[in-house]
Amino acid sequence: MVNAIVIIKGLGVEGKVTLSQECEGSPIYINGTVSGLTPGQHGMHVHEFGDTSNGCISAGDHYNPLHREHGSPLDVERHIGDLGNIKALSNGVATISIRDTIMSLFGDISVMGRTMVIHSDRDDYGRGNFPDSKTAGHSGKRVGCGIIAKI
């Protein structure tokens, strides 16, 4: 069993997210809460670098070691870092409960040490007609982020 934690920080945005995985090849469970968001849907992704030295910008692009197009968490063709959308209620709080079978805390494509990012807008899963739909889901600005750390 491997467990990790992410302390999300941003301008008015904060939260705590945990990741747990029994063994390599088993599903990963991602749970937590993020507050300070505008009500509605927000894209959530793991980005390639574990670097928040310049806020969330220094985290790089979506984590995509298999060089696939952006997609939804249910798509076979997707970035490993594509976690879809979280929904903030009218109080600005989003509760996260995700089971994912692509992402891993084990092996060569582990997300450990990388940055989880919450975006200002809804992820269009690569289905929009925007220039950044196929690469970033047209999810908007990075409003909060934190490094995935082993616990």
Curated annotation (Swiss-Prot):
State how the cofactor is bound.
Binds 1 copper ion per subunit.
Give one GO biological process term. Answer: removal of superoxide radicals
Top-rank taxon, per record: Eukaryota
Q: Which GO terms describe its molecular function?
A: copper ion binding; superoxide dismutase activity
- Indicate which residues the UniProt annotation says bind Zn(2+): 62, 70, 79, 82
Q: Which Pfam families match?
A: Sod_Cu
CDD domains to which the protein is assigned, alphabetical: Cu-Zn_Superoxide_Dismutase (cd00305)
Q: Which PANTHER family match?
A: SUPEROXIDE DISMUTASE CU-ZN -RELATED
Cofactor(s) needed, names only, are: Cu cation; Zn(2+)
Q: What is this protein called?
A: Probable superoxide dismutase [Cu-Zn] 6
